[in-house]
């Protein structure tokens, strides 16, 4: 097991336990155990803390405010086909890999599918562009069709010739996206980097760290500009916070990691 493997597995494990919904589940289990052990005072305090946590993190407006600090860091650029870009780098996450894609032989776009459709839009707009689709699987136990192979099928179905497509089929995270994609790109070429807006700060930092000349093209925005501070949703609010925490801690971990890891 090399340093890339250690980093990948550690990030997956920490990421799982730092999700708010998982932390609340653990806290509820502890509260039940405390009640069962007759430690009612401590159990009641923990129950109140759980209720306050759910109340705050379920607030949609607060989650939007947090997420906008990531999504607003890079504006949507104006792209001209003669600006000297080699093409579009798409970071995986917009197509579901797995057994369904393999069994149905059909790419399964998900709620981050804007990454893939924006790349297609730019390819159709600029006939001189190529697409470099970078991903294998972020799963601990990948099975079925990889996302890269699903993306290959998607672009084939959309009529994009193979001469304009490049597929990096090893990476499991953003660090490896930047590291492994360098095998397919000529030094000094300019690229357009497409990924979700909340993911873009970490992606840009990582790609520039590996010497890439990229411009950010954020997609898949989740945070509205309207307040919605009187709106609560455990699904939307907590999931937005999970995304914010994941990206913020991910950026911190990448900063702490040696560039030659």
PLM features: what roles do these ranges have?
Residues 1-36:
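Membrane-embedded alpha-helical segments of integral membrane proteins
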Residues 6-14, 62, 66-70, 245-252:
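Hydrophobic alpha-helical segments of integral membrane proteins
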Residues 32-35, 58, 254:
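Structural signal for membrane-spanning alpha-helices in multi-pass inner-membrane proteins
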Residues 35-44:
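Membrane-interface helix-boundary motifs at transmembrane edges
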Residues 40, 72-76, 258-259:
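Transmembrane helix-loop junctions in multipass membrane proteins, especially transporters and channels
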Residues 45-60:
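Hydrophobic membrane-insertion alpha-helices, especially the h-region
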Residues 56-237:
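A structural signal for short, hydrophobic/glycine-enriched beta-strand patches
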Residues 220, 226-232, 241-261:
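Extracytoplasmic/luminal low-complexity segments enriched in Pro/Gly and acidic/polar residues
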């Amino acid at each position: 097991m090399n340093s890339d493997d250690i980093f990948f597995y550690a990030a997956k494990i920490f990421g799982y336990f730092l999700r708010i919904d998982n932390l609340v589940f653990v806290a509820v289990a502890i509260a039940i155990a405390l009640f069962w052990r007759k430690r009612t005072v401590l159990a009641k305090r923990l129950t109140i803390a759980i209720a306050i946590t759910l109340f705050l993190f379920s607030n949609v407006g607060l989650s939007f405010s947090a997420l906008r600090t990531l999504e607003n860091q890079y504006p949507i650029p104006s792209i001209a086909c003669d600006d000297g870009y080699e093409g579009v780098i798409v970071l995986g996450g917009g197509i579901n890999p797995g057994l369904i894609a393999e069994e149905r032989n059909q790419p399964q776009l998900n709620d981050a599918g804007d990454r893939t459709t924006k790349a297609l839009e730019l390819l159709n707009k600029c006939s001189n562009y190529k697409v470099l689709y970078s991903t294998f699987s972020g799963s601990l136990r990948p099975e079925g069709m990889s996302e890269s192979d699903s993306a290959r099928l998607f672009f084939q179905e959309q009529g994009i010739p193979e001469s304009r497509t490049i597929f990096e089929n090893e990476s499991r995270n953003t660090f490896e996206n930047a590291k492994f994609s360098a095998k397919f790109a000529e030094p000094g070429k300019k690229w357009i980097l497409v990924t979700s807006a909340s993911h873009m700060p970490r992606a840009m930092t990582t790609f520039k760290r590996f010497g890439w000349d990229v411009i950010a093209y954020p997609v898949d925005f989740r945070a509205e500009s309207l307040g919605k501070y009187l709106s609560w949703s455990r699904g939307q609010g907590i999931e937005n916070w999970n995304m914010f925490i994941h990206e913020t801690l991910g950026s911190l971990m990448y900063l702490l990691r040696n560039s030659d890891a």
